[in-house]
Amino acid sequence: FGFFAKILIAPAFCTQNSVATELIAMAEQLGAMAYIDAPIGTTYAQALAGRGPAGTINFNTSSDRVRLCYPHVKVYDPVLNAERLEPLSARAAGLRAKVDLDKGFWWSSSNQELAGVIGVERQLSAMIDDPQSEVDLLNEQGITTVFSSYGSGFRLWGNRTAAWPT
């Protein structure tokens, strides 16, 4: 149709370095945004350390075409009649598309409710007035995360790309 995708995801597969590298290359070539998850089971400390040159996860990039996502989220699976983990990238990319359509591409997807999310893989400290909370420290390293506070539901938290803080 003459259009190229502007939101690129490969949920679950993007935790592999080879897939993450190709997503980044495609995003750079197309002027798109790639959403990349930390591997399931990644700790808060590993997510932060993954941003550095000695990182052991797939977060070692400084591309302004990448949104790094941590942690996985819990969703209800009606087939299993139970909750299951899902990569945050799928929900974050869907929310980005929804915000683009509803409010415009210039509107932030941060602090917008993540529909269908009922929990997170790992609890993170989150206080709206505490810059030392885990969600804010993740944002300082260019990692998009999930914030839940004051009965507002689970919200995507963070506007920065992987280019931050370089």
Region locations from a protein language model:
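A glycine- and small-residue-enriched flexible loop/hinge signal that marks low-structured segments
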Residues: 1-166
